[in-house]
Amino acid sequence: MPASNALGGPGRWTTLRSLFPVPFRRFPAFLRATIERHGNVFAFKLPWRSYVFINEPALIKELLVTQQHAFVKSLGTRVLRLLLGEGLLTSEDPLHRRMRRVVQPAFHRERIAEYARVMERDGADFAARLHPDEAFDAHAAMTELTLRIATETLFGSDESDSAGTVADALRLMMTEFPAMLTPIGALRQRLPLRNTRRFWRARSTLDTIIYSLIARRRRDGSDRGDALSMLLASEDAGDQQIRDEIMTLFMAGHETTANALTWAIYLLAQHPQVDERAASAARSGDREYVARVVKEVLRLYPPAWIIGRESVRDVTLSDGSRIASGTTVFASPLMLHRRADLFPEPDRFDPDRWLGPEPPPFAYVPFGGGARRCIGEEFALAETAIVLQALLRRYRFERAPGRVEIAPLVTLRPAGPVRVIARTR
């Protein structure tokens, strides 16, 4: 079957010009422009690979659920194993299914209710330490806070002394990651380039911290009911596998929430009416409005901004689109969530849109979907809402001078500092 022969799309050189020289950073703009010209399902090629992009909820459901067995994780996710190893985000079945069963109890609702006490305490402590009327980088602050919460709740450890080191190492590795997706990425991994050396040093730093944590907990021997206790008790997980799962949870367990909180602060600083309602809700205990704020933040800035799969056999989708074996298929919640026919006035920050009818299934997928849906979704939603309420009870935020842009890397993080000023209410 010729690759995607039923689909239109941009020519090879148009694609190259659009994505050169930094494909990942330019990918959202390329997708927006191509959707406008070719619609919500199209094919495109680069010299080394054929691609299909789907932006229809029903087809995304096929990709992630009804025809999931025709696909494996994409090349980008496989390259991500350099950072995370064979953790939940990167592994395939049966390993993924087995390890998900091991870790899943740590994310049950009763456990999250216990974690909420840590989230509330640490969120309130951060709010109390914040200096009013001084500009600060919201993303750096939220990264440090959420990393502390993740280590306390998921790993039963206070790694506050090394929180900055861990955050810096993760940031460096994720910044270097897109370069490894290029055709010369495999070669870059082996050359003694400065950026490559920095990547491997950062990984070594994280490995040292994680293996030390594993050793301490093995010596301790107690079952604390957290994710690390479950991994240590599993007969299926040696230290290497535990390291891979911890690395994945380190990244996903704080990065997702740090980004969500940063984008929430950024949006509320620009929408004072929403901010006032959210603050009033936080003070009165109205969790429903705060939940809608969080839901709307994740619509505009979904953590799983790009989803990639590779077909392992020829596939025909329900709309007749034909996908040849070996084709990379992308879906993008970042594009999907801004479709005007699904979300009227899609660029408007409007938490009350969630009072109306729910969008169609798989039209709103900030954490992905199907069997690979983010295991920590409920954890992230709870943490974002709890910390945001702690901040809103005391402060309103104003933007400080500086440009804010997205960095579409492993997650949808800011490209640089998000400078804001906290004003006492």
Label each residue range with its predicted role.
Residues 20-39, 208, 212, 284-319, ...:
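Conserved cytochrome P450 K-helix E-x-x-R motif and the immediately C-terminal K′/meander segment
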Residues 56, 253, 326:
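Short, conserved phosphate/pyrophosphate- and ester-handling motifs at nucleotide-, phospho-/glycolipid
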Residues 314, 331-357:
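Conserved cytochrome P450 K-helix/beta-meander segment immediately N-terminal to the heme-binding cysteine loop
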Residues 1-98, 117-125, 160-161, 197, ...:
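N-terminal membrane-proximal hinge/A-helix region immediately C-terminal to the signal-anchor transmembrane segment
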